[in-house]
Amino acid sequence: MFRFAQPANVLKGKAPSQIVPPHPKTNSFVHPSAHPLKFNPNSAMTVEVPTHQNGPASNNQYNGNHSRPHFKNQFSSRNSSFTNVMNYGKNHGNNNMSPDSPWYNEVVAFEDCVSQTLYMSQTPRRSNMRNNGNNNMNNGRRTEHPNTQANPLFWDSIGRAMGLYHDLINTPELNSDRVSKLVHLLHNGLRANRNQLTRMNKKPDYDSQSFHKEMTNYLCKSLREISEDVLNGKVELNEYGAMHLITAFKELLLFQEAVNIWKSAINGSNNYTSNIFLNPRVVGVILPILYENGVSYPEIQSLYEKSSSMINYFHPNLSVGMIRASLSASENQMALKLFQKLCEESTEMKYGYLIETHLSFIGECKDLNVAQAFFDKALNDEMPYKIDLQVSYVKSFLKNIWSQTGDFNHIYQIWYKSSLHYGRHVNHGISSSLNDTFFDIFFENYANDKVQGFPMLQNIIQNYHNMKNIDEPFFNIILAKCTVWHDRTILEYIDNSYDAFNIPKTIVAYRILLKSMGSIDDVTTQEILQRWINLICKSDEIGQRFIANADWAALRDATVTWTQRNRGISSSSPMSAVNSLAPSTTNTPSPSLSPIPDRDTLSSARNTPNKIWSGTPVPPPSTEMDFYSHPAFQAANASGAFDDMASATVNPTPRKNFTNGIVPNTPQPIDDRMVLYLKIVKRYSPFCRDSRQLARLTTGTAVKYSVLQEVLNQFQSLNVNDIPVPELRNLKPTCV
């Protein structure tokens, strides 16, 4: 239960006479569908959705009309973004300061550092009207995120701002406005950092101590420090700062920490801070997080009503949060009712709230009929606002379908339609993220049936090729996941597909190819050695100065991990996290999933006509799935193991086979791979980054893999003359 402090001051809102009435006009949808999503401005929002053949009994059909949702009269604010920033939180602090203050210079520097940088890092206001900016959507351009490159001193400004924060923390000049602007700036830093990784314009390795990883750690540490100061009463925030603080922890996936901060704030002795964290802006962010962390829905409703009572108008932040919590609790009627109210109250300036809520219905609504209706409306561009279909919500929709119905045909349709919607010019990060989740489900569905699964995979590759140019991440994802079949023929097929589609391999592909050897039993040590040499040559080609941790990890998985698994000893690898999922039935037309005969067919013309699905029922899904799609894994992966370097798109040079050909498949002792691992480590140890890396490869690895401990005492006496080292230009033997 929560203890709510009595509000000291009720926040001022619009007087009833100032509320703009709903627009009197209604317009029909431009693209009416067979199952329209209906809005009735005079009652709760109503939905008509199809009942799938095998879906839950429909109880979501209500009376309504065919009108478009009513919105308030559209008007635009002409105030500049800079003015908004400078007036940030003006009701909760006094930014006027006398030049006689002993802290005058520090405060001026703080204001210059924070306010100017915050202004430069703001997300530009997007055009949310459906008829404005459609050309941008068609050209594959979407809303830009905070652009740190517009201000080359952005990151330096964040560091200077935190230094000035430390200098001013015990002064009255560091009021709630200034602290809140600093929190907002730190939050923008998180967004900018994430945006750079998502766009895949710079992807460092685990062991590079990358700027992105270091900056994320620094931002998180700074936010934690400010949170502690707020809870200890050293500084205060206004409602904007509190909102950005909780949102930042949510985006860092530190949900429990966000909950703990919020609960401590509202239950603390500082009434001002307690009321700030009960403000609708803040509660709107925390509501869905609270529900997902065990707070009951009646308590969520009570908190919503408590926060609503603090203002005398309908707050969009609060309503969006309550809608998302209601969707998580399967309280769809409440969610739809609030969405209708949000439509009635929205102006163009607030269409962003409608877009966010629309996406929540797609990705978070457990009623697949409702989610499908919102998905179709977004794809058909049938709403008065322009929807940027964020891939995270589509992925969540796919997972909900799979967990509830196990219908892979429905999964395929959503993936195919979404891929068409994103088009040819979408950045690789979006398409790769969608494909990652799709192939997670695909390989779970066919994990024990490669006889049907492999021809299906071939057909999917061809259909994707007909949609858009296949890129390297597409095959990388398939290559990493098809190891579930433990079939060298399939691995070789995917390996050859890079050349078949004229796709140069980056170092990512070479790592995965080596790593995949750990899924095959009938592979020789000579084959593994050749894969290693190919990887080293590629690493040298792209300019690496030492062998990266990701390269060593691929070798370990091909050798030590395979040995431990075959010994029947379970490994403690963090990559083995699984998640139970289960799937929706639909008869929406989609391209044929019928098998194709051979690889040559994959290179056929893109204009092959698609057919309607007429396949046999899909076998029941297995109960395990690699948790590749979790955002925490993807965040780590974005700055780690299987990412190529910035200049890794050059054509690979021909490679000399240092092992004089592949040895025919012959049974080998189970420890041979482990010995090979130690010999390669010893031979290439001069190319380690430092002695600590070498220690992790030997004694450190033996801690997690007990089978390595058995042969580790042979390391110093191993003869490694049979392990060749190719001619290298950039990799240098720097580790002695």
Curated annotation (Swiss-Prot):
It comes from the Eukaryota. Residues 566-578, 602-613 have a biased composition (Polar residues). Keywords: Membrane, Mitochondrion, Mitochondrion inner membrane, Phosphoprotein, Transit peptide. Phosphorylated. Phosphorylation promotes binding to RNA. Residues 125-140, 579-596 have a biased composition (Low complexity). May be involved in the processing or stability of mitochondrial mRNAs. This is RNA-binding protein RMD9-like, mitochondrial. The lineage of its organism: Eukaryota, Fungi, Dikarya, Ascomycota, Saccharomycotina.
